[in-house]
């Protein structure tokens, strides 16, 4: 089925960002169902989307349904299948923050800069402004640490094994900043644009730098970190702004 992805994309008039998103979703779908497309494998695929947001689910189901129709038209499938993409969102007066399935953030992508920005927020809780100021000299990949200096002092953060490969690739160039623009940092808007394009490509357009930072907080809390420890990791003067996450 994977062989049909590129002809399918060529048959549609898609912007580059949308094309990358379609390709990612369809490769993921084909890897999961293999060559056996039937009601059972499609049901299992739908179940695998249960940890995603409503918007991400609808996007993936819509993409796959279009692909299934294309396969039927091309006689690659003898039967026409269509998954139910009607998803009812659950609403409450007080939205509850939950930890997300972030496996898609680590998958292969054409949006490498946006991906690394997202991972630095998700894994280290950094803000776009802090990321803009990161220099290659701040990283010690051998010791797996980042030393971030600010007016409040130096924060030493551990780099996870999952994050290291992305940093190793990004720090190969001879430059001053991690994201370098003629030995100067890029603008704040540039970082938001890169992040937005990456999030859209993985079907998470509703997320933002702030919501990824909240995921960092929730993950650290789940790992057993105290509110004081998380405040220190984020470089906060006080843990007051974190109280709502620890009352959940």
Swiss-Prot record:
Catalytic center residues: 213, 245
GO cellular component: cytoplasm
UniProt GO MF annotations: DNA binding; tyrosine-based site-specific recombinase activity
Span of domain Core-binding (CB): 1-72
PROSITE patterns (UniProt xref): CB, TYR_RECOMBINASE
CDD domains: INT_StrepXerD_C_like (cd01190)
Domain Tyr recombinase: 92-248
Keywords from the UniProt entry: Cytoplasm, DNA integration, DNA recombination, DNA-binding
GO annotation (BP), single: DNA transposition
Location in the cell: Cytoplasm
Pfam annotation, one family: Phage_integrase
UniProt signal peptide: none
Domain of life of the source: Bacteria
Similarity annotation: Belongs to the 'phage' integrase family. XerD-like subfamily.
Function according to Swiss-Prot or TrEMBL: Putative tyrosine recombinase. Not involved in the cutting and rejoining of the recombining DNA molecules on dif(SL) site.
Protein name according to UniProt: Tyrosine recombinase XerD-like
């Amino acid at each position: 089925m994977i062989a049909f992805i590129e002809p399918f994309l060529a048959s549609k008039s898609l912007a580059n960002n949308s094309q990358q998103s379609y390709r990612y979703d369809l490769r993921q779908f084909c890897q999961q169902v293999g060559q056996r497309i039937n009601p059972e494998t499609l049901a299992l695929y739908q179940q695998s989307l249960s940890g995603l947001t409503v918007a991400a689910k609808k996007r993936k189901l819509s993409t796959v349904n279009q692909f299934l129709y294309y396969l039927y038209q091309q006689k690659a499938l003898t039967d026409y299948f269509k998954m139910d993409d009607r998803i009812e969102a659950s609403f409450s007066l007080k939205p509850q923050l939950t930890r997300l399935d972030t496996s898609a953030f680590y998958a292969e992508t054409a949006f490498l800069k946006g991906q690394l920005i997202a991972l630095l927020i998700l894994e280290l809780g950094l803000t776009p402004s802090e990321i803009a100021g990161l220099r290659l000299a701040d990283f010690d990949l051998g010791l797996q640490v980042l030393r971030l200096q600010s007016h409040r002092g130096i924060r030493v953060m551990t780099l996870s094994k999952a994050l290291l490969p992305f940093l190793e690739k990004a720090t190969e160039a001879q430059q001053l900043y991690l994201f370098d623009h003629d030995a100067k940092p890029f603008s704040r808007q540039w970082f938001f644009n890169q992040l937005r394009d990456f999030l859209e490509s993985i079907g998470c357009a509703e997320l933002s730098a702030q919501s990824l930072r909240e995921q960092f907080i929730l993950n650290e809390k789940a790992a057993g970190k105290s509110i004081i420890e998380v405040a220190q990791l984020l470089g906060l003067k006080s843990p007051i702004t974190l109280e709502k996450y620890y009352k959940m």
